[in-house]
Amino acid sequence: MPWLQVRLAISPEQAETYEDALLEVGAVSVTFMDAEDQPIFEPELNTTPLWTHTHLLALFEADTNAELALAHLSLLTGAELPEHSAEVIEDQDWERSWMDNFQPMCFGQRLWIVPSWHAAPQPDAVNLLLDPGLAFGTGTHPTTALCLEWLDGQDLKGCNVLDFGCGSGILAIAALLLGAEQAVGTDIDVQALEASRDNAGRNNIAAERFPLYLPEDLPPQQADVLVANILAGPLVSLAPQLTTLIKTGGRLALSGILAEQGEDVAAAYAESFDLDPIANRDGWVRITGRRR
């Protein structure tokens, strides 16, 4: 069915007031969107910052009188409404539309990431089946792609891999499918561990080959290969810990790093690793090396 969509241009300080007021006047959903393509990187813990210029989208049933709803909204907030618009939009099968847009992707020479509902384009390739139903890595972001391509180029036969900040489990599962003996995943988010476990099962990875832990429960064992696709700040602060988790001669791959942050992150690891040239893609970088 169609919906009435109301769009308001607000500041972060106005967000809570207008969200509550819109729900009060009958909105069935309220969504915040970036109005100017402003990225927010590394927010403080336990915060959900909004963009400097934010669009608030509210959906109402199609027979809602837009003028009356907006007038009521102005009364509730006690202020003149900010820049706004209202239009009727047709309903869509959002899930089907999203699924149609998520297509198989190739990384390197052997590895394909294939949506679980899609046939593998190359059945004889290394095909990782993924259900990106939660907001964790799918391969579409440059940092994930950089890590997957690096893994595809490594000889992982018999290796023990640690995926620090495993998210969907995409990197660890890729390593296992590419020949690793075992991969350990750790993440601060319990939902990420659940997503990793589900995706491992989808790829017929036995639980003993892919144990999953919260960071505080991670066993003190060293890996042959460590991958961490998180953020620059944590990568710098965790450098001493991550270094101890890699065997002498072991390999390291770090991403989640903006190009302008690359040198600072590399400097945090340079004392203990022989680092390769930094790989760059679309403003993001990957740092790799081998522990001395």
Curated annotation (Swiss-Prot):
Recorded catalytic activity of this chain's protein = L-lysyl-[protein] + 3 S-adenosyl-L-methionine = N(6),N(6),N(6)-trimethyl-L-lysyl-[protein] + 3 S-adenosyl-L-homocysteine + 3 H(+)
What residues does S-adenosyl-L-methionine bind to?
144, 165, 187, 229
What's the short name of a Pfam family annotated to this entry? PrmA
Q: Which Gene3D superfamilies match?
A: Vaccinia Virus protein VP39 (3.40.50.150)
Instruction: Give UniProt keywords alphabetically.
Output: Cytoplasm, Methyltransferase, S-adenosyl-L-methionine, Transferase
Keyword Methyltransferase in the entry? The reply is yes
Q: Return the broad EC class.
A: transferase
Keyword Nucleotide-binding among record annotations: no
Q: Name one GO molecular function term.
A: protein-lysine N-methyltransferase activity
Q: Where in the cell is it found?
A: Cytoplasm
> What SUPFAM superfamilies would the database entry show?
S-adenosyl-L-methionine-dependent methyltransferases
**Highest taxon, organism lineage:** Bacteria
In the record, biological process GO terms are:
methylation
- Similarity section: Belongs to the methyltransferase superfamily. PrmA family.
The name this protein carries in UniProt is: Ribosomal protein L11 methyltransferase
